């Protein structure tokens, strides 16, 4: 039992590292490097290829996180009865886990908006030209930038909640 629990926790942590680590790598390392890459068309190609690849990897990691998260909760004694009676939510563990789950849900929504709406729109705008496109590009970049910052903050808070649960 202990080995399987530890294995599930390890897989959960590794999937989280892939998701959050990838987000931080793109924001802190890749985007600043791409801004200096010449010619500009190469930036678009690298960003598009990387975004497409990371989108697939990150959503697989998210699926693994969700499955292992449920298994971890069950292994820690969370029951449907405790949830339905409200007993779960009155405990320290329940309050922290609920906070973590709300943050993860917010991250999932923000990630979906980024990956399936704003990110593809940004790639499309980077490929087009013209004054109107430039203004839309700047606006979209700001949205993507703020969305990434908020998601990163939520990611840090999720890790803080995980530490409090350990």
Residue ranges of model-derived segments:
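Polytopic transmembrane helical bundles with strong interfacial aromatic enrichment
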Residues: 1-166
């Amino acid at each position: 039992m202990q080995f399987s629990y530890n294995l599930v926790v390890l897989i959960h942590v590794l999937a989280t590292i892939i998701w959050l680590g990838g987000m931080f790598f793109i924001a802190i390392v890749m985007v600043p490097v791409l801004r200096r890459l010449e010619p500009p068309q190469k930036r678009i190609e690298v960003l598009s290829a990387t975004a497409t690849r990371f989108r697939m990897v990150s959503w697989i990691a998210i699926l693994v996180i969700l499955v292992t998260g449920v298994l971890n909760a069950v292994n820690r004694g969370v029951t449907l009865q405790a949830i339905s009676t409200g007993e779960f939510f009155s405990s320290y563990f329940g309050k922290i886990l609920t906070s973590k789950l709300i943050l993860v849900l917010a991250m999932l929504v923000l990630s979906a908006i980024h990956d399936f709406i704003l990110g593809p729109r940004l790639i499309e705008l980077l490929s087009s030209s013209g004054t109107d496109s430039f203004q839309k590009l700047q606006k979209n970049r700001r949205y993507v930038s703020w969305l990434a910052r908020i998601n990163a903050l939520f990611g840090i808070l999720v890790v803080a909640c995980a530490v409090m649960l350990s």
